[in-house]
Amino acid sequence: MAKDAIKMTGKVIKAYNTDEYDVELENGIVVRAHISGKIRVHHITILRGDTVDVELSTYDLTKGRIVYRHR
């Protein structure tokens, strides 16, 4: 994303398919997020309950992209 993207940490609460998830952010807001290309290429599995880093666009704060899965 652009330099002005907002990076936040959250927890996956629901998985829709292999690359769409509902993530509850630290501040309690739930956003729909998809996985980034690097996570898809390296076949990193994201499950319900995982802690992830999400980048949010400043234009639409209801959608984001999962850029990192914490261990």
Swiss-Prot record:
UniProt-listed InterPro entries: NA-bd_OB-fold, RNA-binding_domain_S1_IF1, S1_domain, TIF_IF1
Q: Mark the transmembrane ranges.
A: none
- Which GO terms fall under molecular function for this chain's record? ribosome binding; rRNA binding; translation initiation factor activity
User: Cell membrane as a keyword?
Assistant: no
Q: Which domain of life is it from?
A: Bacteria
Which UniProt key words apply to this protein?
Cytoplasm, Initiation factor, Protein biosynthesis, RNA-binding, rRNA-binding
Compartments where located: Cytoplasm
Subcellular location, principal: cytoplasm
* HAMAP family referenced in this protein's UniProt entry, alphabetically: IF_1
What is the annotated role of this protein in its UniProt record? One of the essential components for the initiation of protein synthesis. Stabilizes the binding of IF-2 and IF-3 on the 30S subunit to which N-formylmethionyl-tRNA(fMet) subsequently binds. Helps modulate mRNA selection, yielding the 30S pre-initiation complex (PIC). Upon addition of the 50S ribosomal subunit IF-1, IF-2 and IF-3 are released leaving the mature 70S translation initiation complex.
The record's subunit annotation is: Component of the 30S ribosomal translation pre-initiation complex which assembles on the 30S ribosome in the order IF-2 and IF-3, IF-1 and N-formylmethionyl-tRNA(fMet); mRNA recruitment can occur at any time during PIC assembly.
Can you say what this protein is called?
A: Translation initiation factor IF-1
